């Protein structure tokens, strides 16, 4: 990488100093400023090979400056940093032409890596959309944890594409919110968003629901009916709980993805389709493939870009933000204004949340509606959590219990839950997967996403670790712990 002139704009002197030292060690010339007007003057004078800019500065928002820079110097790469770690910030940075978005606090090694990629990239900067900056300020996703930051960055990169996305995650993690965000802030935002839940439709009607049917196609088909593909033309089709789709319908869906056309049930004329497919499931599709319940070729067609949503227990630092968000929603809907004291909030952060964000939202709505006190305390929260169903209660682990004993205890409970029946086939792989995922994920977290160090820690070959990361759909967040 040859030496370059890098322009840094940030009103935090400490950040300017750190970036100057780090980039100068690599041989670059670094010019820094604490305001947007000076940065604009340098750019207008033709200075700089790369820009690193903050969003909030005393005189102007850094995001608002990007379109002006792109008009006079379209080839200039821009890296955006921000402490406003929301999906909106990431999307606005991407749609206005930023090369990369980094949330604060950032990892210095990651920033240096992004700088190297920006200076060495031969790919022309993405064209600015005609309606850039139209995104509203309503936040479809809440959270500033490292796991959510990585998801925001992935989503921002996908907004200008039509790539097929499959979202995985436990029930209640917000899979449909992600699908709607991909639509609402993407290139098909002016088209329809059509959702269909495979688990909620009788198996024999799924093909008719998806592709429509002709009059007389089957008993009771007294009129022609349009399917979801036709309804979603020009927009996004969200296939929720794709793991519950029958094999016959999977075959027809695969043909649509391969050929870009379909026929209605009972019809013969091919119909061209123009939709973006976003799928979601709480099930393990690879296990379903091994069990012969899901087509492997369809899996690879759908999982062009896989996104795994973490359960709430893996991002408990987001609980206070979510609680405040739901309380604000309640007050906006006419319920009394409430707050939650710190001991109660700490208890909510310790809870396991088997129902994830949906369970937390329901709890907050109950607190807002059923209790008269303005400040909700620990006693109220404890009472509410105690009233949840047994399956939703946090499991207290016996003190000093070893891993082997804990696994044995959980497996005994698992077999006992089936009473006289037996669990479904493939139990060995399912149990190993449940152990492997947290083991590898936590090892990567401990090594700040460094796969070489994680492989050494685990005693695995680096290629073996990479394959397991891919097979287990583990998201690697580099430089964060």
Curated annotation (Swiss-Prot):
Database matches in PROSITE patterns: RESPONSE_REGULATORY, SIGMA54_INTERACT_2, SIGMA54_INTERACT_3, SIGMA54_INTERACT_4
Annotated residues for binding of ATP: 169-176, 232-241
Transmembrane parts of this sequence: none
Compartmental location: Cytoplasm
GO molecular function, one term: sequence-specific DNA binding
Residues that bear 4-aspartylphosphate: 54
Keywords: Activator, ATP-binding, Cytoplasm, DNA-binding, Nitrogen fixation, Nucleotide-binding, Phosphoprotein, Repressor, Transcription, Transcription regulation, Two-component regulatory system
Nucleotide-binding recorded as keyword: yes
Post-translational modification comment from the UniProt entry: Phosphorylated and dephosphorylated by NtrB.
GO cellular component: cytoplasm
NCBIfam families: ntrC
Record-given protein name: DNA-binding transcriptional regulator NtrC
Organism: Azospirillum brasilense
Gene field: ntrC
């Amino acid at each position: 990488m040859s030496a370059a002139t890098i322009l840094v704009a940030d009103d935090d002197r400490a950040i300017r100093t750190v970036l100057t030292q780090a980039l100068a060690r690599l041989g670059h010339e670094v010019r820094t400023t604490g305001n947007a007007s000076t940065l604009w003057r340098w750019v207008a004078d033709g200075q700089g090979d790369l820009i690193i800019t903050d969003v909030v500065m005393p005189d102007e928002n850094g995001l608002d400056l990007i379109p002006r820079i792109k008009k006079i110097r379209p080839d200039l790469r821009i890296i955006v940093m921000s402490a406003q770690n929301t999906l909106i910030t990431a999307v606005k940075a991407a749609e206005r032409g930023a090369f990369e978005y980094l949330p604060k606090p950032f990892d210095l090694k990651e920033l240096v890596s992004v700088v190297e990629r920006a200076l060495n990239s031969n790919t022309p900067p993405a064209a600015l959309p005609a309606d850039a900056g139209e995104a509203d300020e309503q936040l479809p996703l809440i959270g500033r944890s490292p796991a959510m930051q990585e998801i925001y960055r992935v989503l921002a990169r996908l907004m200008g594409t039509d790539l097929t996305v499959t979202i995985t995650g436990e029930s209640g993690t917000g899979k449909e919110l992600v699908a709607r965000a991909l639509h609402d802030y993407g290139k098909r935002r002016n088209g329809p968003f059509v959702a269909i839940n495979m688990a909620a439709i009788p198996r024999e009607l799924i093909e008719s629901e998806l592709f429509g049917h002709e009059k007389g196609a089957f008993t009771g088909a007294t009129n022609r009916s349009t399917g979801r593909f036709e309804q979603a033309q020009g927009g996004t089709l969200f296939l929720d709980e794709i793991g519950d789709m029958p094999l016959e319908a999977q075959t027809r869906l695969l043909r649509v993805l391969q050929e870009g056309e379909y026929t209605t049930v009972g019809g013969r004329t091919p119909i061209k389709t123009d939709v973006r497919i976003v799928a979601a499931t709480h099930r393990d599709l690879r296990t379903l493939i091994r069990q012969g319940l899901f087509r492997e070729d369809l899996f690879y067609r759908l999982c062009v870009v896989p996104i795994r949503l973490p359960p709430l227990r893996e991002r408990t630092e987001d609980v206070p933000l979510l609680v405040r968000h739901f309380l604000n929603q309640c007050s906006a809907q006419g319920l009394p204004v409430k707050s939650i004291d710190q001991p109660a909030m700490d208890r909510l952060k310790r809870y396991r949340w088997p129902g994830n964000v949906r369970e937390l939202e329901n709890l907050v709505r109950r607190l807002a509606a059923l209790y008269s006190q303005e400040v909700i305390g620990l006693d109220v929260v404890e009472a509410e959590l105690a009233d949840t169903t047994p399956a939703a209660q946090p499991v207290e682990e016996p003190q000093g219990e070893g891993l082997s004993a804990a696994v044995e205890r959980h497996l005994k409970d698992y077999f006992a839950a089936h009473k006289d029946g037996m669990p479904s086939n493939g139990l060995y792989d399912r149990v190993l997967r449940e152990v492997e995922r947290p083991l590898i994920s936590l090892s990567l977290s401990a090594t700040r996403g460094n796969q070489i160090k994680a492989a050494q820690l685990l005693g695995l070959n680096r290629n073996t670790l990479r394959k397991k990361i891919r097979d287990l759909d583990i998201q690697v967040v580099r430089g964060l712990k």
